[in-house]
């Protein structure tokens, strides 16, 4: 199993465990997450309840601009490496906090990994809030990995 695929497997396992515990609701409770299709896009919008955000431990950090001295190819955006998620074909993504309790997956191109920082060749702009803790669980929610309808 390649490094890329073992990372995906690790994310999927974590997502199943967390989402199963987060997905149980009673008739009086709202579902923990709503997945809404966005017109003209194949990437949906995820809206979580406050309780789901708390249970998943969602944490965000803003995209930062790398100092020119830190990156030999000039100014690039940087994010914490844990914000990067991989889908089944190895594509790299981040979840951007687009509104209150709302997240949307956005493609990124990782130019380099320097310790716990991913240097981006393309991705969200400086200042955008990316999910650094809980991104794998959001991917599981988007793809309904828990198997619940």
Label for each model-derived stretch:
Residues 2-4, 22-65, 93-149:
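Short alpha-helical boundary/capping segments at helix-coil junctions
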Residues 11-14, 23, 73, 116:
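Generic anion/oxyanion-binding catalytic loop in active/binding sites
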Residues 63-77:
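Short, glycine/small-residue-enriched coil/turn segments at secondary-structure junctions
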Residues 77-83:
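Sequence-composition feature that favors extended, apolar/low-complexity stretches
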């Amino acid at each position: 199993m390649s490094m890329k695929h073992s990372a995906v497997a690790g994310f999927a396992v974590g997502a199943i465990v967390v989402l199963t515990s987060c997905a149980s609701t009673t008739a009086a409770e709202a579902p923990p997450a709503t997945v809404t299709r966005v017109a003209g896009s194949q990437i949906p919008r995820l809206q979580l309840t406050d309780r789901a955000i708390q249970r998943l431990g969602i944490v965000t950090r803003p995209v930062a601009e790398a100092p020119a001295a830190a990156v030999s190819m000039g100014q690039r955006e940087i994010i914490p490496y844990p914000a990067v998620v991989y889908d089944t074909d190895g594509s790299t993504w981040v979840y951007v906090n687009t509104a209150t309790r709302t997240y949307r997956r956005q493609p990124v191109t990782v130019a380099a990994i320097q310790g716990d920082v991913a240097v981006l060749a393309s991705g969200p702009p400086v200042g955008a809030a990316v999910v650094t803790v809980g991104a794998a669980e959001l991917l599981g929610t988007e793809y309904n990995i828990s198997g619940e309808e």
